[in-house]
């Protein structure tokens, strides 16, 4: 009987979520988010983010805090209530051309400068369909930070 219980216990525990050290991306939920030196409200604030949906890489966790790294390699801790699953990315090339379709042979829509925040709608192979301001189109994944 104990062997069956142990087997059932292992069957229903989501090991990937509980024991994983895999890094993954999230975005900042609010316009104002504090990056702290440690995983508690008792630690001092290192950086004060003022950009909603800024993508961050989750590197570690401690109770209700997540250790993050941003596109400028700043690291620190934020409370989980300040993170969102909404997908976004930052343009990391000096200029990135947005196309009307997921091919270099389609019409160019816009030139985006480095640092531009884009909302990800979907990704297909090496391309992502994005929105930013009044522009909608496709960007090469290689020019974006915030995707795995």
Question: Can you describe what each PLM-predicted range is?
Answer:
Residues 40-43:
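Second-shell loop/turn segments in exported
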Residues 17-37, 47-52, 59-101, 105-134, ...:
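SH3-family beta-barrel domains
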């Amino acid at each position: 009987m104990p062997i069956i219980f142990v087997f059932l216990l292992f069957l229903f525990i989501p090991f990937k979520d509980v024991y994983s050290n895999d890094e993954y991306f999230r975005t900042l939920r609010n316009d104002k988010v504090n990056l702290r030196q440690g995983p508690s409200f008792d630690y001092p604030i290192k950086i004060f983010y003022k950009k909603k949906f800024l993508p961050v890489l989750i590197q570690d966790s401690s109770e209700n805090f997540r250790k993050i790294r941003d596109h400028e390699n700043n690291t620190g801790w934020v409370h989980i209530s300040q993170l969102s699953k909404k997908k976004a990315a930052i343009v990391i090339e000096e200029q990135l051309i947005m196309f009307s379709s997921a091919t270099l042979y389609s019409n160019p829509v816009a030139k985006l400068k480095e640092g531009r925040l884009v909302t990800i709608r979907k990704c297909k192979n090496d391309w992502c369909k994005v929105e930013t301001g009044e522009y909608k189109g496709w960007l090469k994944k290689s020019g974006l930070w915030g995707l795995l």
